[in-house]
């Protein structure tokens, strides 16, 4: 298998630690070996100056990533919460969730053109779109994107993508946006369970706890509104959407591995092409069977449809390519922060009741989501941190006791000459 640099997995809506399943698969740049001067660490002011300059550069880079992270978190939160609320608003006048799914997925075609525009602006070595396309097609194998590869490695993901979005949008018709957004956060727990079973990922007890919390939150959310038909169906739809998304990510890791930014953009554009070619017939059938019917095309809220599509496209662009400028964990926070945003909007625009059971369920699912953001070596880091704090406390205690011990001795030494007189 060929190696890639600057990797990112598509549809990173709830990957772990952000959005790359269970491992950070952002830019996998090997750490450069230290130079001779740094390796030998020469004594003197020169070595100290180099160390201070190196630390200053590292701190600047980290600070820059944090600032970018705040911007990315805001974009993820705003686009995800905005698309959810706009979909709910659209269904008041246009009751066609599958048609909305089809329309928004068509916009995936823009991924590769947008990526190429960024490549032309940023890259020093300019390539034509055809050259860049051929290079990215190597991701699918030595023969590139053949008809067989299209139907075996792209079509299944196109179906999963459509199911994920359709079930999510259909659930918004049944239950409020707050419940939908928080239940979709269980996606990370499902990814962990599937990757543990299928991909043989490392077992982590804290992630098992997170999965248990997610399941408990689903049960409590069902109990919050009572076991009414609309509530149960809506919750089942969201859980199904989260499951389809988790299956999408795990299968992508299993069959395709991870991709460069250009390869991911090409893959997502291919999903848009698949949607146009093979999914278009379904909205047509639903229209003529009056399952999703509207009187005239003038009744379609085109502004809402385009706004939802732009927000969803922005959400996926930021999640898939934001890893180039910030930490994956910061990006994931935008997903969970969209829950309180939806809660505030629902409080003022709908008749949602935040009873004790619903609030506890939201907290439990959110806690499980945050536990899945912990890195694999979090326990080692925690032990090191506690050890450092313990050593520092001992040093401070020793220094304070030393100061108390030297104080009387110094005073007695100063007092001795006066007694000698």
Swiss-Prot record:
The UniProt entry's GO CC annotations, sorted and at most eight, read: membrane
Chief subcellular location equals membrane
Which keywords annotate this record?
A: Membrane, Transmembrane, Transmembrane helix, Transport
What ranges does the record list as Low complexity composition bias? 37-49
TM annotation in the entry: 66-86, 98-118, 149-169, 179-199, 208-228, 232-252, 266-286, 305-325, 326-346, 352-372
Q: Which Pfam families match?
A: EamA
Region annotated Disordered sits at 25-53, 394-421
Enumerate composition-biased segments (Basic residues). 411-421
The record's Gene Ontology biological-process terms are: thiamine transport
Question: What membrane topology is annotated for this entry?
Answer: Multi-pass membrane protein
From the UniProt record, list the reaction(s) this protein catalyses: thiamine(in) = thiamine(out)
Q: Where in the cell does this protein reside?
A: Membrane
Instruction: Report the family membership.
Output: Belongs to the SLC35F solute transporter family.
What is the documented function of this protein?
Mediates thiamine transport.
By what name is this protein known? Solute carrier family 35 member F3
Which organism's genome codes for this protein?
Mus musculus
